[in-house]
């Protein structure tokens, strides 16, 4: 049995006959396999270029093993060259943007895009990610933030570069 982190992936998998289950139907997942936008040496990640990072983080957190597959261009010494996606409630977008600017970053609305949960994404650039766990928690503590694309608390267990 398989699960998917986005509505688009679920549709594609069902088209080829893969039986998809809900995370609500299982206690845990043995393996979660996905890519990343950036990977640091300590296996922290930035994910969410496709806008599904909240669901991806939920599934990764419910998985015994999180395997990340990427090409060498995704490996970085320090996270933050790729914008950090921040999923926000629409009514809090401007408030969250001001708070992100106070952290030293530049948020930009991902125009014309809504997440599978119907929320907006602010792509945050220009901010140093010296401590992925602290920044992940600091961004998530802003009222109106659903989640962000830093995977510091739930890092990948293994990286496969190909």
Enumerate the language-model features and the residues they cover.
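Conserved phosphate- and dinucleotide-binding cores of soluble alpha/beta proteins
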Residues: 10-162
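Short active-site oxyanion
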Residues: 1-2, 44
